[in-house]
UniProtKB/Swiss-Prot annotation:
Domain MTTase N-terminal: 9-124
Subcellular location(s) of the protein: Cytoplasm
Name of protein: Ribosomal protein uS12 methylthiotransferase RimO
Cofactor detail note: Binds 2 [4Fe-4S] clusters. One cluster is coordinated with 3 cysteines and an exchangeable S-adenosyl-L-methionine.
Gene Ontology CC: one annotated term: cytosol
InterPro entries named among the record's database cross-references: Elp3/MiaA/NifB-like_rSAM (IPR006638), Methylthiotransferase (IPR005839), Methylthiotransferase_CS (IPR020612), Methylthiotransferase_N (IPR013848), Methylthiotransferase_N_sf (IPR038135), NA-bd_OB-fold (IPR012340), Ribosomal_uS12_MeSTrfase_RimO (IPR005840), rSAM (IPR007197)
Gene Ontology terms, MF aspect: 4 iron, 4 sulfur cluster binding; aspartic acid methylthiotransferase activity; metal ion binding; protein methylthiotransferase activity
All residue ranges annotated as the Radical SAM core domain in the record: 141-382
Native species: Herminiimonas arsenicoxydans
Catalytic reaction(s) noted: L-aspartate(89)-[ribosomal protein uS12]-hydrogen + (sulfur carrier)-SH + AH2 + 2 S-adenosyl-L-methionine = 3-methylsulfanyl-L-aspartate(89)-[ribosomal protein uS12]-hydrogen + (sulfur carrier)-H + 5'-deoxyadenosine + L-methionine + A + S-adenosyl-L-homocysteine + 2 H(+)
Keywords of the record: 4Fe-4S, Cytoplasm, Iron, Iron-sulfur, Metal-binding, S-adenosyl-L-methionine, Transferase
Entry cofactors: [4Fe-4S] cluster
Xref: SUPFAM superfamilies: Radical SAM enzymes
Residue ranges annotated for the TRAM domain, each copy included: 385-454
Length: 454
C-alpha cells in the first residue's frame, strides 16, 4: 500500500490598504503559488495566515491591528507585513509586536523576500518551484478585466502630514522593460483597463537619472512621458484603457495631455493637490500653489476638453484660518474638479505636522470637510448633468439577473469614482458581459453617477 502524498500547505491571506499594498499582496501570492503553496479561503483551513497591513492614518492602524487580532484568535499562526510593520510608536517600539506579541514575524512593505523567508521558516516549501503553473501576469486580486501596474516604490517628498517615506523609503523606479513586460502580459491575459500607480507617478525615473532602457529592441527612457506613450501604443491593439493615478503637477505632465486628447490613454488625471492656499501648502511642504494649479488645469482642459480631474484635499490642517479655508473653497469653485475626496485633518503618529502650532479643533475640521463636500456635490452634479444626451464608451463591471449592468466610463476609476448604470438591452438575445466595452447614451445623472442605455 502506497503512502498518500503529504497535504499541500495552505496559506490564508488578508490584504488591507491602498492599491500599492494590493500589488504587494499580488506579488506575495504569486510567489507562494510558484513555490507550491495553496491559498485558504478561511482561517480554519489555513496552516498560517499572512496579513498585509496599512499604517497611514489612525483608523487604518486600528483596522490592521484588529485584523491581526482576528487572525490570531481564529488561526494562531500569523505573519504580518505592510506599512504598519515598519511603524514605531512614540517610544520607538514596534507597534505590532507590542499589541500582538504572538505573531510569528513582522516585515515592512514591499518585502517579498522577507515574507517568504518567514513562510519558509514556519511552513517549509512543499516542492520545487512550479513556475509553469503560473499565468505570465502572475496572480491578481482584482477582477480579470482591470489591473494595477505599480511603476515605482517609495517617495522623495517629505510632506509634513505623511509618513509613507518612513515606511516605504525613497523613490525606487522599476526598470522600464520590466514594467512594459508586465503590462503586455496583462493585456494578453484579457485586462481591458490598466491603472498606473505609485507614490509619485510623475517622478518615475528620477532616482536613476532617467536611465535609458530597451523595449522590443527600441530605446525607451525611464521617464513618465515615454512610459505613458509606450503604454498607450501597447494598449491600442487590445482596445484597452490606460489610466494614470498619483500624478504630481510637474511641468512635464503637460506633454501627456495631448496623448489624452488623441485617445492614446484615458483623459483622466488623479492629481493629489491637498490644498490651494500657498501658506497652507508651505506648512504641508507641498509644491505649487492654487494660482499655478488653476492655470495648469485651465491649460490642460484647453488642450483636452474631455479631461477628467480627480484630486484629494485636507480640511482643517494645523494653522488653517477661516480665510485660508475660504481661499480653498474659491479655488474649488473656479477649478471645478470632476472627482474630489476631502479628509478632515487627522494627526498621524510620526508626522512632522503634529508639531505645528494652532491646531484646528476637531469639530471645525469636520465642519470644513462637510462644507467642501457640499460644494463639490453641486460641482459634480453640474458636470455630470452636462453629459446627459451624449454617447460614451463604458466598461462593464457587473451584470445583474435582469440583464442590466453596472459599468464605468473613462471618467470613473474603480472603487473611488462613480459608476454608469446601464439599462438592460431591449433585444432579449443581447447580453452584456463583464469586461466588455459598450457604447451607451447617457439618459440621466445625479451628483455621483450616470444612467444610460445602449
Amino acid at each position: 500500500m502506497t503512502n498518500a502524498p503529504p497535504a499541500t500547505p495552505k496559506i490564508g491571506f488578508v490584504s488591507l490598504g491602498c492599491p500599492k499594498a494590493l500589488v504587494d499582496s499580488e506579488q506575495i501570492l504569486t510567489q507562494l503559488r510558484a513555490e507550491g503553496y495553496d491559498t485558504a479561503k478561511s482561517y480554519d483551513g489555513a496552516d498560517l495566515v499572512i496579513v498585509n497591513t496599512c499604517g497611514f492614518i489612525d483608523a487604518a492602524v486600528q483596522e490592521s491591528l484588529d485584523a491581526i487580532g482576528e487572525a490570531l484568535h481564529e488561526n494562531g499562526r500569523v505573519i504580518v507585513t505592510g506599512c504598519l510593520g515598519a511603524k514605531k510608536d512614540a517610544n520607538g517600539d514596534d507597534i505590532i509586536q507590542k499589541v500582538h506579541p504572538k505573531v510569528l514575524a513582522v516585515t515592512g512593505p514591499h518585502a517579498l523576500g522577507e515574507v517568504m523567508d518567514a513562510v519558509h521558516l514556519h511552513m517549509p516549501k512543499p516542492h520545487a518551484p512550479f513556475l509553469d503553473l503560473l499565468p505570465p501576469q502572475g496572480i491578481k486580486l482584482t477582477p480579470k478585466h482591470f489591473a494595477y501596474l505599480k511603476i515605482s516604490e517609495g517617495c522623495n517628498h517629505r510632506c509634513s502630514f505623511c509618513i509613507i517615506p518612513s515606511m516605504r523609503g525613497d523613490l525606487v523606479s522599476r526598470p522600464i522593460a520590466d514594467v512594459m513586460m508586465e503590462a503586455e502580459n496583462l493585456f494578453k491575459a484579457g485586462v481591458k483597463e490598466l491603472l498606473v500607480i505609485s507614490q509619485d507617478t510623475s517622478a518615475y525615473g528620477v532616482d536613476i537619472k532617467f536611465r535609458m532602457g530597451f523595449w522590443n529592441g527600441k530605446p525607451v527612457k525611464t521617464h513618465m512621458t515615454q512610459l505613458v506613450e509606450a503604454l498607450g501604443e501597447l494598449a491600442a491593439p487590445y482596445g484597452a484603457w490606460v489610466r494614470l493615478h498619483y500624478v504630481y503637477p510637474y511641468p512635464h505632465v503637460d506633454a501627456i495631455i495631448p496623448m489624452m486628447a488623441e485617445g492614446k490613454i484615458l483623459p483622466y488625471l488623479d492629481v493629489p493637490l491637498q490644498h490651494a492656499h500657498p501658506d497652507v501648502l508651505k506648512r504641508m511642504k507641498r509644491p505649487a500653489s492654487g494660482e499655478k494649479n488653476i492655470e495648469r488645469i485651465q491649460a490642460w482642459r484647453a488642450m483636452c476638453p474631455d479631461l477628467t480631474i480627480r484630486s484629494t484635499f485636507i480640511a482643517g490642517f494645523p494653522g488653517e484660518t477661516e480665510a485660508e479655508f475660504e481661499y480653498l473653497l474659491d479655488f474649488l469653485k473656479e477649478a471645478e474638479i470632476d472627482r474630489l475626496g476631502c479628509f478632515a485633518y487627522s494627526p498621524v503618529e510620526g508626522a512632522t505636522a503634529n508639531d505645528l502650532p494652532n491646531a484646528v479643533p476637531e469639530e471645525v475640521r469636520e465642519e470644513r470637510r462637510g462644507r467642501v463636500m457640499l460644494l463639490q456635490e453641486e460641482i459634480s452634479k453640474k458636470r455630470l448633468q452636462a453629459k446627459v444626451g451624449k454617447t460614451m464608451r463604458v466598461l462593464i463591471d457587473e451584470v445583474n439577473r435582469t440583464g442590466a449592468a453596472t459599468a464605468r466610463s473613462g471618467a470613473d476609476a474603480p472603487e473611488i469614482d462613480g459608476v454608469v448604470y446601464v439599462k438592460a438591452p431591449y433585444e432579449p438575445h443581447i447580453k452584456y458581459k463583464v469586461g466588455e466595452f459598450v457604447d451607451v447614451k447617457i439618459t440621466g445623472a445625479d451628483a455621483h453617477d450616470l444612467w444610460a442605455e445602449a
